C-alpha cells in the first residue's frame, strides 16, 4: 500500500505522512474475536508508574490474533484484511472449512480469496504455516515460534521477516531483521512470507496530538528537571548533565548492557550488537 501526503493547510497536515488504508475493510471487527481492553496508564497492580509517559489515547478493542495456527491440515479462505489499532501490521480474517473464523497476521501479497493452510508439509506461499525444518533454505518467514507449540514470537511487527540461512542437526539457523543469527528448533513453526505494511517505517505522525491519540504522553528530559527529580537535573541555565548518562534511578544508560539471560546465549550464533561494529 502506498503512502499518503496531505495539502499543507495546517502545520500538522504539512508534516503528516500516512499509509493508504483504503483497500482495507471499513467495518467493525468480528465481535466474538474481540474483547475489551482497559488502559493501564503505565501503572502496575499497586498503582505505581512502572512505564513513564504512558496514558490516555483512543479507546481500543483488542483483536484476538491466532499466533499458534493450531488447526492443522484444514484449509481456510481469507475473507478480508483489516486494520488493527493494537499493532503496526494488518490482520486478516480467515474462515476455515468447518466454519470457524480467526484473525491472523496478514503477510505481504496476501489478498482476499486466498487459501491458507497449516500443516507439516504445505506449499511455500504467503500465509501458510509449517515447521521450520521442513522449509527449504532461503525461505522468508514471520511469526516464528521460539518454543515448540508456544505460538509465534519472532518477526511480528510491520514489514519484518526472518530468513532461514542454514541447518544444524535438529535446528535451523534464522537471520533476523536486526542481523542476529540464532538457532531455532526445526519443529518450531513459522508462517511463510514477510509481515504486511512495510511502509509503516516511512510514516510521519505529523503532530504531537496524534501521538497523544496513541496513548503516549510528553517525554521530558532529565537535564530540564530539578535535582530532586533526576540525576541530570539542576544547574544554572542550560547544562549538559555533567556525568555519564543515567536513568532517573542512577543506572548507566545509552550503551550499558542489560541482558541477563545467559541460558539462551548458546542459541545466538551472531549477536545483533556485534554486527553493528
Curated annotation (Swiss-Prot):
State the InterPro entries in the record: NA-bd_OB-fold, Rib_uL2_dom2, Ribosomal_uL2, Ribosomal_uL2_bac/org-type, Ribosomal_uL2_C, Ribosomal_uL2_CS, Ribosomal_uL2_dom3, Ribosomal_uL2_RNA-bd_dom
Q: Which UniProt keywords apply?
A: Ribonucleoprotein, Ribosomal protein, RNA-binding, rRNA-binding
Q: Which parts of this chain are annotated as the region Disordered?
A: 199-277
Q: Name one GO molecular function term.
A: rRNA binding
Cite the PROSITE patterns for this sequence: RIBOSOMAL_L2
State its role.
One of the primary rRNA binding proteins. Required for association of the 30S and 50S subunits to form the 70S ribosome, for tRNA binding and peptide bond formation. It has been suggested to have peptidyltransferase activity; this is somewhat controversial. Makes several contacts with the 16S rRNA in the 70S ribosome.
> Whom does it interact with, and what assembly results?
Part of the 50S ribosomal subunit. Forms a bridge to the 30S subunit in the 70S ribosome.
> What is the protein's given name?
Large ribosomal subunit protein uL2
Which source organism?
Answer: Nitrobacter winogradskyi (strain ATCC 25391 / DSM 10237 / CIP 104748 / NCIMB 11846 / Nb-255)
Q: Which gene encodes it?
A: rplB
Amino acid at each position: 500500500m502506498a503512502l499518503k501526503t496531505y495539502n499543507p493547510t495546517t502545520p500538522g497536515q504539512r508534516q503528516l505522512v500516512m499509509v493508504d488504508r483504503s483497500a482495507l475493510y471499513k467495518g467493525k471487527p468480528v465481535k466474538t474475536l474481540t474483547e475489551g481492553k482497559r488502559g493501564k496508564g503505565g501503572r502496575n497492580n499497586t498503582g505505581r508508574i512502572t512505564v513513564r509517559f504512558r496514558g490516555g489515547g483512543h479507546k481500543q478493542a483488542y483483536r484476538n490474533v491466532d499466533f499458534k495456527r493450531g488447526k492443522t491440515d484444514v484449509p481456510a479462505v481469507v475473507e478480508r484484511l483489516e486494520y488493527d489499532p493494537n499493532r503496526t501490521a494488518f490482520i486478516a480474517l480467515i474462515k476455515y472449512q468447518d466454519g470457524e473464523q480467526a484473525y491472523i497476521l496478514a503477510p505481504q501479497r496476501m489478498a482476499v480469496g486466498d487459501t491458507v493452510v497449516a500443516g507439516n508439509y504445505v506449499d511455500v506461499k504467503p500465509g501458510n504455516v509449517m515447521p521450520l525444518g521442513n522449509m527449504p533454505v532461503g525461505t522468508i518467514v514471520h511469526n516464528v515460534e521460539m518454543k515448540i507449540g508456544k505460538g509465534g514470537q519472532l518477526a511480528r511487527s510491520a514489514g519484518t521477516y526472518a530468513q532461514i540461512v542454514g541447518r544444524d542437526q535438529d535446528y535451523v539457523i534464522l537471520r533476523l531483521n536486526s542481523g542476529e543469527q540464532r538457532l531455532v528448533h526445526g519443529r518450531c513453526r513459522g508462517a511463510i512470507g514477510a509481515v504486511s505494511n512495510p511502509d509503516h517505517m516511512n510514516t510521519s505522525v505529523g503532530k504531537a496530538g496524534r501521538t497523544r491519540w496513541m496513548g503516549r504522553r510528553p517525554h521530558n528530559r532529565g537535564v530540564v528537571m530539578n535535582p530532586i527529580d533526576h540525576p541530570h537535573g539542576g544547574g544554572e541555565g542550560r547544562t549538559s548533565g555533567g556525568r555519564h548518562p543515567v536513568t532517573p534511578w542512577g543506572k548507566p544508560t545509552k550503551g550499558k548492557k542489560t541482558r541477563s539471560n545467559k541460558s539462551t546465549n548458546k542459541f545466538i550464533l551472531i549477536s545483533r550488537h556485534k554486527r553493528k561494529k
